Curated annotation (Swiss-Prot):
Similarity section: Belongs to the HrcA family.
Stretch forming the signal peptide: none
Taxonomic superkingdom: Bacteria
Function (record text): Negative regulator of class I heat shock genes (grpE-dnaK-dnaJ and groELS operons). Prevents heat-shock induction of these operons.
Gene3D superfamilies for this protein: 3.30.450.40, Winged helix-like DNA-binding domain superfamily/Winged helix DNA-binding domain (1.10.10.10)
UniProt keyword annotations, A-Z: Repressor, Stress response, Transcription, Transcription regulation
GO molecular function, one term: DNA binding
Cysteine disulfide partners in this protein: none
Protein name: Heat-inducible transcription repressor HrcA
Length: 339
């Protein structure tokens, strides 16, 4: 698509713009590109790049800036990623030593933000939706506590408001039935199987089990997915983002609600390594003026979540990419040791 001279000039323009934040003119390109070209030849090539949509000319400047298409070509074809310096690697390894998983998620998010100086994101691991054991306890006349032990050994509680009171024996009978027949399965699986079973059971037990399935599903779904966000306020220091308060509000709203971020990070789980979304590629409106660099992390080789950095499209990709990549690998190692 582009000849060698055009590639070198585009690479130089993107690197200078990322470094300086100002539109890049032909004189700067002539100085830094290392090509024996006249200013007129450089202007002609830049005009061609503009026609192809790789660069654009701001109205207030004679220089040019990269477009999202220009950034994409740069990232896919021209980017030279630098290894993460050993000081940063050591800091990551020391900070992400085997620990409680939730603490590791928070630490990883903070480290991503500190090292990149942008916002760090970590999608918490997908929990196994199955349960190991359940138990019913009477709270009052028509209130029953459902206790769920997950396959990871974590405990979730939900209060069920019943239409009638239940004896301790009835609650034990219902719990035993659940545990003997469905331990190791999800509540969705239980729901599908119970359709056939409930017709052979007493109505009072039927109602209790149906209520337990609904409550259990809600309990595990509520704690299923989350995104830990750190350092979002650092984006206030990015001029091209802070100058548009409307876009900035949308971005911070996305950080708070997290639903769109979850969907985007979830899509990245299947990526083989680092993935970069530039501007509108994320299809998430609040990120239209941002780039998102993500990588999946795993436990014993099984992908369980995604982490990443959100920053401006004018970010130092050659530095952010290894930060995200190395953090994902070190977090994977720490989680595998902790399990």
């Amino acid at each position: 698509m582009l000849n060698d001279r055009a590639r070198i000039l585009l690479k130089t323009l993107v690197e200078r713009y990322i470094s300086e934040g100002e539109p890049v003119g032909s004189r700067t390109l002539s100085k830094h590109a290392g090509l024996d070209l006249s200013p007129a030849s450089i202007r002609n090539i830049m005009s061609d790049l503009e026609e192809m949509g790789f660069v654009a000319s701001p109205h207030t400047s004679a220089g040019r800036v990269p477009t999202p298409r220009g950034y994409r070509f740069f990232v896919d074809t021209l980017l030279t990623v630098r290894p993460l310096d050993q000081v940063s690697v050591n800091h990551l390894e020391n900070s992400l030593a085997a620990s409680d998983p939730q603490r590791l998620m928070t630490a990883a998010s903070t480290l991503l933000s500190d090292l990149s100086q942008f916002a760090g994101l970590v999608m918490t691991p997908r929990r196994n939706p199955a349960f190991r054991q359940i138990e019913f306890l009477t709270l009052s006349d028509k209130r029953v506590l459902l206790i769920i032990v997950t396959m990871e050994g974590e405990v979730e509680n939900r209060v069920i408001v019943t239409e009638q009171s239940y004896s301790a024996a009835a609650l034990t009978e219902a719990a035993n039935y659940f545990n003997q027949n469905f331990a190791g399965h999800s509540f969705d699986h239980v729901r599908s199987k119970l359709r056939d079973e409930l017709g052979r059971m007493r109505d009072d037990i039927t109602r209790l089990m149906a209520a337990a399935v609904d409550a259990g599903t809600q309990a595990l779904d509520a704690s299923q997915d989350n995104v830990v966000v750190s350092g979002s306020r650092k984006l206030l220091d990015v001029e091209e983002l802070s100058s548009n308060m409307r876009s900035l509000r949308r971005l911070f709203d996305a950080f708070e609600k997290k639903t769109g971020l979850l969907q985007l990070l979830d899509q990245s789980r299947s990526a083989a390594g680092v993935q970069i979304f530039i501007g509108g590629e994320s299809e998430l409106l609040p990120l239209d003026e941002c780039s998102l660099v993500t990588a999946p992390y795993s436990v014993d080789g099984v992908v369980v979540g995604t982490l990443g950095v959100v920053g401006p499209t004018r970010m130092a990709y050659e530095r952010v990419v290894p930060i995200v990549d190395v953090t994902a690998k070190i977090l994977s190692s720490a989680l595998s040791q902790h399990k």
